[in-house]
Design a protein with these regions (language model features):
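Conserved phosphate-binding/catalytic region of the ribokinase-like
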Residues: 1, 153, 203-312
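Glycine-rich phosphate/adenosyl-contacting loop at the front of the ribokinase-like
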Residues: 1-72, 312
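Structural motif
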Residues: 2-4, 125-126, 187, 218
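Glycine/charged-rich beta-loop-alpha catalytic/anionic-binding loops adjacent to active sites
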Residues: 16-25, 129, 235-244
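Short beta-strand scaffold segments in enzyme catalytic cores
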Residues: 39, 87-91, 227-230
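Short, conserved phosphate/pyrophosphate- and ester-handling motifs at nucleotide-, phospho-/glycolipid
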Residues: 41, 191, 253
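Conserved N-terminal subdomain of the carbohydrate kinase-like
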Residues: 47-131, 302-303, 307-312
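Conserved beta-alpha-beta core of the PfkB/ribokinase-like small-molecule kinase fold
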Residues: 126, 132-209, 226-227
Length: 312
């Protein structure tokens, strides 16, 4: 398997064009940071798998059916009678504002534990996790960290997307758990607001200095519009933001991870990986839905179309 993800998938109820209390109809679809990445990589021709739990309910069945239909290995996505599948409400409040409300306390996904993991990660090229799972519950946190340890022991590359969710935990907890997990990662993806939170300062350069200090092979600082900066032992690489009309900003970070990991899995360069991440993010935010705009292989731009990243 090329990429295994660990997390919690949810069902989203989207009011589309208005607040929930005014919506006569809603759109329903699968969401989740890690499921978005698993789906995106599968669409681009990579073998991907998902470790997690859903409820033994209709929402859980829809999630399993959707991921399987997208080509994701769901062998380790199990159903439990002990808790329901998590639900997310997405409201459109006008002027591009989106409000998200979680119904995931004591959810099936939060019961994830170490027993759900493969014993041996040999043969898995990459593990991808996010900061969301680290704050779902103590057992989900333990499972995520143990997955990272097992992956490293097997020589599997580990990528961590910060993905801070302030509705799930206080800022101090988000930062502490991220830093604990970052010590087990090879690559870290983090947004500018998240980096500023970790740095404890909004001053220019504070977040960037924090990201540079992370002891990982590659630290990527994501900006708006798909722009990004990567820091490695070889220096700094910058790619500009791409102009795009935003229809739905939710899912942009996951989309960046898809394009970024796709290029790395194909043996591409870091500059191309940054460009690939930006290209997929720009495509996804121009459409409604978390994963619906993720490209298939024949829709992914050729690396020959990418601009040359600036190395400093």
């Amino acid at each position: 398997m090329e990429c295994l993800t660990v997390g919690e998938p949810l069902i989203c109820l989207d009011s589309m064009a208005e607040p929930f209390d005014a919506a006569a109809m809603v759109r329903k679809y699968v969401v989740g940071a890690e499921s978005n990445v698993a789906i995106g990589l599968a669409r681009l021709g990579h073998s991907s798998g998902y470790v997690g739990r859903v409820g033994s309910d209709s929402c859980g069945r829809e999630i399993v059916r959707t991921l399987r239909g997208e080509g994701v290995d769901v062998t380790r996505l199990t159903a439990t009678d002990a808790a329901p599948t998590a639900i997310l409400l997405k409201e459109r409040l006008g002027s591009g504002r989106v409000e998200v409300t979680y119904h995931r306390a004591a959810s099936a996904g939060s019961t994830l534990d170490v027993s759900d993991l493969p014993d041996d990660f040999t043969g898995i090229r990459r593990l991808h996790v996010s900061g969301i799972t680290l704050v779902l519950s103590p057992s989900a946190r333990a499972a995520t960290l143990e997955a990272m340890r097992r992956a490293r022991a097997a020589g599997t590359r580990v990528s961590l997307d910060a993905n801070f969710r302030r509705k799930l935990a206080p800022a101090s907890v988000l930062v502490a758990e991220f830093e604990r997990a970052a010590a087990l990662a090879d690559e870290v993806l983090i947004g500018r607001s998240e980096a500023a939170l970790c740095a404890g300062s909004d001053e220019d350069g504070a977040g960037e200095a924090y990201v540079r200090s992370l002891a990982v092979d590659i630290a990527v600082l994501k900006g708006r519009g798909g722009g990004a900066t990567a820091f490695t032992g070889a220096g700094r690489f910058d790619v500009p933001a791409q102009p795009v009309e935003v229809a739905d900003p939710v899912g942009a970070g996951d989309a960046f991870a898809v394009g970024f990991l796709h290029i790395l899995l194909d043996g591409g360069s870091l500059p191309d990986a940054l460009e690939g991440g930006g290209a997929v993010a720009a495509r996804v935010v121009a459409r409604h839905g978390d994963y619906h705009g993720l490209p298939y292989e024949d829709e992914f731009p050729s690396t020959a179309q990418f601009q040359t990243a600036v190395q400093r």
